[in-house]
Amino acid sequence: MKPYSILWLFPTLLVFAGCADHSSQSNGTNTSTNSIVLDSTASVPLPTNPNHPSKEETPMSIAPGRLLQAVSAEDLNLVQTLSDQSTAMIDEQNEKGESPLLIAVHHNMIDIAKILVDHGANINLQDHIQDSPYLYAGAQGKTEILAYMLENSEPDQSIVNRFGGNALIPAAEKGHLANVKLLLTDGRVDIDHQNHYGYTALIEAVALRDGSKIYQDIVRELLAHGANKELRDNQGKTAEDYARELGYDQLLSQLT
């Protein structure tokens, strides 16, 4: 046998030799051993690299901000993976107070929003300007996300936006007929809620817009679901008063 062919045995032999010598000393003998027994079942722990821990030693965890980043990058697969792994960061907020779900709603990321809702994301959590995923979806015409929230979560109707409005008022004012229908059919929203200016959804649909067909349709939906035509805003005006002042004859005919 060539001399170098047994060099690889030396570390192992030394380990077991040391173990054997230690064992003999612990038994009160000083007998040295000239033989080495290799135990095929013995194992010597290998050093671990702290920069590359094994999955068994350190389970993967979600670092703060990682889910927010995944949503912002529209990385559907990573959002799914992180949400499946842990919901601890499902409602984390960035420097603007935006949650992962609110970011998804902002950009109408329908599939990502559904994943987050399925994993318990809070649809009522507000950012620093008092937008919540539910309120924003209602106000900005994110109809598919709004529908999913209504089916799979519980909107808190006591939470209002920075103008004091609920989801219905801006939906009506911005001409989002599908959202108006959805919210009215769901039935949980207060159809006669008044914001800081005393505006209802009905008043805003008349007073703040152009009286076009889409607003005629919205007014029709509101009236069909029992909107109170007699309510007055902070200036003491009704929706009918505004329709008359602005010359919106089609709306006026609906309101009188």
Model regions: which residues?
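C-terminal motif of bacterial Sec signal peptides marking the signal peptidase cleavage site
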Residues: 17-18
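Bacterial Sec signal peptide processing site at the extreme N-terminus
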Residues: 21-31
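Ankyrin repeat A-helix N-terminal signature
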Residues: 69-74, 103-109, 136-142, 170-176, ...
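Conserved ankyrin/ankyrin-like repeat signature
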Residues: 78, 111-112, 144-145, 178-179, ...
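Ankyrin repeat domain, specifically the short helix-to-loop turn at the C-terminus of the second helix
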Residues: 83-88, 114-122, 147-156, 181-190, ...
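Ankyrin repeat boundary signal
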Residues: 90-93, 123-126, 157-160, 191-194, ...
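Leucine-rich solenoid repeat scaffolds
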Residues: 223, 228-256
